[in-house]
Amino acid sequence: MHELSMAQGIINAVIDTAESNNATEVTEVGIEIGRLAMINPEQLRFMLSVLVENTIVEDADIKIEEIPVEINCPECGFKGVAELDDKDHYAPIVECPKCGNKRISILNGKDCVVKNIVIEKPDDD
């Protein structure tokens, strides 16, 4: 259930950033979740919807994008997107789609990142 702590961290970062920029409201938050981050996007979305209540993020459009796993295979030289065998949610298997090698380098797809925040600021009258 680490989605709750992840959601809390995201909301704290968004609110801190918005407040440091004198925002009156957050209208959009873009989040990228790597397939290897072990975060369920639906659970994260639910946790976020609860945590934003009565904050400047409450009415924001929260966009969550899943990022594929990108690898580099030292065996055959493949560099690109790999499929993820996640039958076992806690220990997914990533292998080279070209040669089947499991000793690969992960280039992308492990992180959870707040990619963008759109805010409203008070009118300068």
From Swiss-Prot:
Binding residues annotated for Ni(2+), in chain numbering: 2
GO terms assigned for molecular function: nickel cation binding; zinc ion binding
InterPro entries registered for this protein in UniProt: Hydgase_Ni_incorp_HypA/HybF_CS, HypA/HybF
Keyword set includes Metal-binding: yes
Keywords: Metal-binding, Nickel, Zinc
Amino-acid positions noted as binding Zn(2+) in the UniProt annotation, renumbered to this chain: 73, 76, 96, 99
GO biological process: protein maturation; protein modification process
PANTHER family for this protein: HYDROGENASE MATURATION FACTOR HYPA
Function: Involved in the maturation of [NiFe] hydrogenases. Required for nickel insertion into the metal center of the hydrogenase.
Stated family: Belongs to the HypA/HybF family.
Protein name as catalogued: Hydrogenase maturation factor HypA
Organism (species): Methanobrevibacter smithii (strain ATCC 35061 / DSM 861 / OCM 144 / PS)
Lineage: Archaea, Methanobacteriati, Methanobacteriota, Methanomada group, Methanobacteria
